[in-house]
């Protein structure tokens, strides 16, 4: 497994150093001091990424001369989510009280969409720094009115969880596919692809199929083959996304 770009840990405000050092150890990123906008001039950091800790909200930025918007976990208002998205269509027939697992949490966008229409969903994310950003996003969400209380987050490898628990629905987004062009990926997805090892969670599909009581939903790009070559019971496809539904 190879990592294409590195992620360095910085802190935003001078009075946050002690807290920042603690967090950098907690999420296993190399502590590199106070964030500066000219870090792109240093070969060590140039064209990599900076995780910038802030007590109010942490985020990630590419370390480059060009200024870009921060990458963070931010959820839209759940009232803006259509009831007829393809993801929600893939859940048709599932009870609102069903137990649901997002086994590949990432930045939580899909889990949030599911939680907008279902009573609860457990999100599992195994990468500490991704989990930290997602935790902050859920924290800020809980402070808003009309809170979605059904989001549960754990720092854990989902295969370990599924060794002991089963769910009605298990959702998988194996986004580590290198066949797609960079331009087809959003900034947050590109960050994950570039800063995490190449890995195919093929075994996770097999575990999920054994553990799901109702269905497994796999998110794919329409150009990609079925995961493990396993044909689903049916698929729901748009221009950029295909949901493969495996009834269990």
Each PLM stretch: what is its role?
Residues 174-204:
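Mobile active-site "lid"/loop adjacent to the S-adenosyl-L-methionine
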